[in-house]
């Protein structure tokens, strides 16, 4: 009897595969059940290997218990994408595989991979065939539809220019060629809107894939995609390696959005992984945005990406006018100046809608004692508690712990307790008391928790005449609110004073995106930006509305300072119950990095949120002139850490190309 040996990846936090044997040949990418200690785990065949040199009759190499499926989980391009991701992000390969396997297929049971038996036919619906394109849209479609192999394209389109229609036409062309399409969106709340547009355009089943669906529903979509029963899938970052049969096009909507970055567990960028996948599949990929990331614009400069522009709004509508409002000497009510409230009132009287943006949920972000200065903070995290009126609790936005509101200061027993600042709930309350007959619609993480909540809110917005929308970034992303003629931004200054390297990039994207919600059906729209820094050079440059000009200047500055995207960075993150353990581990790391050419390191530094869930958090900032240098150093560190007793006392991880230092 022949015995074959395999390296198998299992989902554990170790950067290695494990060798098992079996009496038959098994394809790479196949799911198998294997004994692991006292457990039985699902593993993925990574490679077939020769008989291990040290093998003897007393060998402890265990046997594979069972082949779970007759089909592989991942075909070669997706399999190779996972190998690349594990290598690039320096993350345990078993956990990377596990990230992209549906939950139901991670279980040891009788579920196997096979077709559902429900094929869809795709045609353009008659009602949608007469849609008239703008000349900009026609030009973009003509250029993009010519691309048939790997060649990343940036579709730059100002807000309201009709990028979604371009996506639809490109998808139609792809379907006519007998191929399938994957569309990635940054957030779950954007999937219903885009899903509706595709459903209105095409007959046939449109696949939807995101984390709020049941695991069974996600598995069904995954299987239908794998066996060619659906040819269009719209999903969030978890769908980036959706195994669509004969995929011919990947579209990334709002490519700049940081929600494409997973910040917990396996830290990866779905945008960058999608680009790698399209390279391995040798298919075109389109990245759409009104505010492209500096990383993407750098690649355009270097001729690695092609830029296609849509410079005018649909129907020739003018972009809204951005106005800064100096609030240094203005009393604020719920975070709003009197001039802001007057502008809201004038807009409502005309029968139009207003969008009020404040990137902070809850009622008040600070609960303070007037007697001794005590501030309510989380016992497990280094963060202030936020009062949520809807729950009558003080909430930690880091670990979501809830605390009762005390009537006496726990430090000095004073009853002189006050709430300061404003969140979405407080703004909502002030507006409800000011505009009694006007619907106030709050859109934040708390108001959209229930399944279908966002769809109901969007429906209410579209069915209302005069209304005031109050919300966080959820409102700023990709939504079409044609009745909004005034947008108000309450806390833009946070981006001007942030220590983050990419703070101004984030701020410019946010301001342009929020302003883009206004004036989609009206030439007289405006945006009010409340600020204590009305003369700030960067703010006034952003206010001009010329994002590409601002981004180009930012790239020039970053190039001179050797900041990303002109250098490669990694945060070595570290957490433990004691600051001393972090310090010993990271200082030892700094010492060995000091001898590495092409790499510099700063630290150890406390994270901006220095304590979370009972653990102290620190990091080392590692910067390299080239990605190859960085990758080489990180591989070296992994080997070293495995030898160190200090690494066993902390939880460490690499965050490559990080989007923040929180």
Task: Describe the predicted segments one by one.
Residues 102-108, 653-661:
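Long, charged, helix-prone linker segments
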Residues 1-152, 322:
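Terminal, basic amphipathic appendages of nucleotide-handling enzymes
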Residues 585-591, 631-640:
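Short amphipathic alpha-helices in soluble, non-transmembrane regions
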Residues 58-61, 372-374, 611-623, 656-662:
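Short, low-order "capping/linker" segments at domain edges
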Residues 129, 134, 149-583, 591, ...:
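Inter-lobe coupling/hinge segments of SF2-like helicase ATPases
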Residues 40, 50, 603-628:
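Short, intrinsically disordered low-complexity segments
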Residues 9, 15, 28, 581-594:
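A short, contiguous, amphipathic alpha-helix enriched in charged residues
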Residues 440-441, 597-607, 648-656:
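Short beta-strand elements
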